[in-house]
Regions:
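Short alpha-helical catalytic segment bearing the HExxH-like zincin motif
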Residues: 34, 105, 157-162, 324
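Divalent metal-coordination and catalytic microenvironments
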Residues: 37, 85, 110, 164, ...
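Specific transmembrane helices
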Residues: 80-81, 86-90, 109-134, 332
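Short helix- or helix-capping micro-motifs
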Residues: 137-142
Length: 388
C-alpha cells in the first residue's frame, strides 16, 4: 500500500468570515444528496427503457442519436456507488468509537436492505423470471459473480447490490481499525489499482471468450467508485476545508475528467470493448461524480440551497431503492404482455411507443416502490430504534 498523507495544508485555505453565514457542509440531513439519488435512479430507468436491448438500426438518425445518448443512463449506478461510498464512510467514521459500532451498523443496514431485496427474490422465483441457482447465489450476495459459477446473470440490477453488500461486509472493519489517513491510503490504492484489474480482466475475458461486459460487474472492478466517495468523506472530516477549497477541488476534478477524456478519445476510452476503455472509461465519470457531490454540498449549505433541492427528485430519491429493484421486473412484464399480443391493437410509431412504454414503466415502478416503502420497508425499518 503506498504511503500517503492528506495534503490538507496544501489544499486548504483559511476559513473565511463569510463561511459563517452558511450552514456546515456536513449536516445530519443533506437533502441535496437525496436529489442526486433521484437523478441516479431515473438515469437507470432511462437506460433500460431507451437503450438496453434496443435495436438502434430501426430508427432514423436523429432519434438514434437520442437513444444512443440514453447509454449514459447506466452511469446512474456509478453515481450510486460514489454516493454510497461517501455516505457510508462518513457514517462509519462518525460512529467508530461507539461500543455498539458493528451491531448498530449491520442491524440498521439489514433492516433497510433485506425486506425489498428478499421480496424481489421471491417474485423472481414466483414468476419464473430467474432460475433457482441464480436466486440462491443472489441471496448469498454473489449476483455479480454468477458467471464465475457458470450461471447467467438473470436479473441484472442485482449485480450492483452485491457490490454494495461486499462493501458493507468489509468496510466497517477497515474504518474501525485504521486511522482516517490510513483509510485514505486504502482508498487511493483502490482507485489506482482498479483500472489495472479491469485491464487484466478484459484480456482474460477476451482470451477465454467470455462475455466481456460481465467483467465490469465484478466487485474488484467496480470498487473505485465507492473508494472515490469514501475519499471525499475522509477529506471533509480530516482536513475541514473551507468552502473555497472545496470549490477549487470540484473544479480541479472536472478539469481532470475532461483531460482524461480528451487524451483517451483517440484510444477508445468510450468503448469498453477496447483496452483503454475497459480500464479507464469509468475513471473520469467517478471524478465528475465526486465533483457533483462536492458542488451539491456547497449549494445545499448555502443561502441558495433551494437550487440544489427538487421536491420531485427528492421523492424519487426517497423511493430510489425500490424503484431500482422493481423496475426491471415491470419492464420485463410489459415486454411479456407485448409479446403475447396485449398491445396488438395499439398502433403507434415505434419511437412514440418507446415513450409510452417509459411512461408505463415509470408510473408502475413508482407505484410499486411507494407501496413497498410504505407497507413493507418503513414498518420494518422502524424497528432499528428498538434493536440498536
Amino acid at each position: 500500500m503506498p504511503r500517503i498523507t492528506l495534503s490538507c495544508q496544501l489544499l486548504s485555505t483559511p476559513s473565511l468570515a463569510s463561511d459563517r453565514i452558511f450552514e456546515p457542509i456536513l449536516r445530519p440531513v443533506m437533502p441535496e444528496l437525496n436529489t442526486l439519488r433521484g437523478i441516479a435512479v431515473l438515469m437507470v430507468l432511462v437506460y433500460h427503457a431507451f437503450y438496453w436491448s434496443i435495436d438502434l438500426s430501426m430508427f432514423a438518425p436523429a432519434k438514434r442519436l437520442f437513444l444512443t445518448a440514453a447509454w449514459t443512463g447506466r452511469l446512474g449506478v456509478n453515481l450510486f456507488f460514489v454516493l454510497s461510498g461517501f455516505l457510508i464512510t462518513g457514517l462509519l467514521v462518525d460512529t467508530k468509537t461507539r461500543q455498539d459500532y458493528y451491531k448498530r451498523f449491520y442491524i440498521r443496514r439489514s433492516l433497510r436492505i433485506l425486506p425489498a431485496f428478499l421480496l424481489t427474490l421471491v417474485v423472481l422465483l414466483a414468476v419464473r423470471a430467474a432460475p433457482l441457482n441464480f436466486v440462491l447465489l443472489s441471496a448469498a450476495y454473489l449476483a455479480n459473480l454468477t458467471p464465475l459459477f457458470g450461471v447467467a446473470i438473470a436479473y441484472p440490477v442485482l449485480w450492483s447490490l452485491a457490490v454494495e453488500e461486499h462493501f458493507y461486509l468489509v468496510w466497517p472493519a477497515v474504518v474501525r481499525r485504521l486511522s482516517n489517513r490510513a483509510i485514505a491510503a486504502v482508498c487511493v490504492s483502490i482507485v489506482a489499482l482498479s483500472p489495472i484489474t479491469r485491464l487484466i480482466s478484459f484480456f482474460v475475458a477476451r482470451r477465454k471468450g467470455w462475455v466481456s461486459y460481465e467483467i465490469f460487474d465484478y466487485t474488484w472492478n467496480s470498487a473505485d467508485g465507492l473508494a472515490c466517495g469514501a475519499l471525499l468523506a475522509i477529506f471533509l472530516r480530516e482536513c475541514r476545508p473551507s468552502r473555497k477549497t472545496i470549490a477549487r477541488l470540484t473544479g480541479l476534478l472536472v478539469v481532470l475528467a475532461i483531460v482524461i477524456w480528451t487524451v483517451g478519445l483517440p484510444f477508445g476510452i468510450f468503448s469498453r470493448h477496447l483496452p483503454v476503455g475497459a480500464a479507464l472509461q469509468i475513471v473520469p465519470w467517478n471524478f465528475g461524480f465526486v465533483a457533483l457531490i462536492g458542488f451539491s454540498l456547497l449549494l445545499g449549505s448555502s443561502p441558495r440551497r433551494r437550487w440544489s433541492r427538487s421536491p420531485v427528485l427528492e421523492f424519487f430519491g426517497d423511493i430510489s431503492y425500490g424503484l431500482y429493484l422493481y423496475h426491471l421486473l415491470i419492464l420485463n412484464g410489459l415486454g411479456w404482455l407485448d409479446y403475447h399480443g396485449f398491445f396488438a391493437n395499439l398502433h403507434f410509431p415505434l419511437f412514440l411507443g418507446l415513450w409510452i412504454r417509459f411512461g408505463l414503466l415509470l408510473g408502475l415502478s413508482v407505484l410499486a416502490a411507494y407501496l413497498s416503502g410504505r407497507y413493507l420497508e418503513q414498518p420494518i425499518l422502524h424497528l432499528k430504534d428498538r434493536w440498536t
